[in-house]
């Protein structure tokens, strides 16, 4: 539902420097791999179904809420879209995302991870979705699906929303972990800092 300014459909591509995308235009790796030697600056969605290596920072300007989720025209409601989709198929671990920089990842929509995420940075998520028919019947900011892995080097802040860590999945962060409503863990969960429930939207 978004225009795409940078896409890898198959094969591999490498960019030695930084990348800046126009507002409202996504980054899309359908298969294959994309390596970026610097920062990525954007105000839209990251779709990664292959291998994406960002050696610098992933800077998503979440103040530009008109563009920040995958659902065009419905962006005033954070529940209508996600800001990061890593992989596509539950249980297959079909994508890999590496972020080398230490600037916090900031996502206005929610986050879906079917694959592996390795980030030296922390992560803040403001959006949420509902998971009807699942173990979580509440607002969920981050879904780490079955067999998925997610590592964050710093603090993870999910605002006042829930976290779902699926069967055999792995989650860890190098700082504090803040969530709301509930954390459901069916896999492995570790936080190096404090674990705190945030009741403030």
Regions inferred by a protein language model and the residue ranges of each:
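Extracellular beta-strand-rich, repetitive "passenger/adhesive" scaffolds
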Residues: 1-201
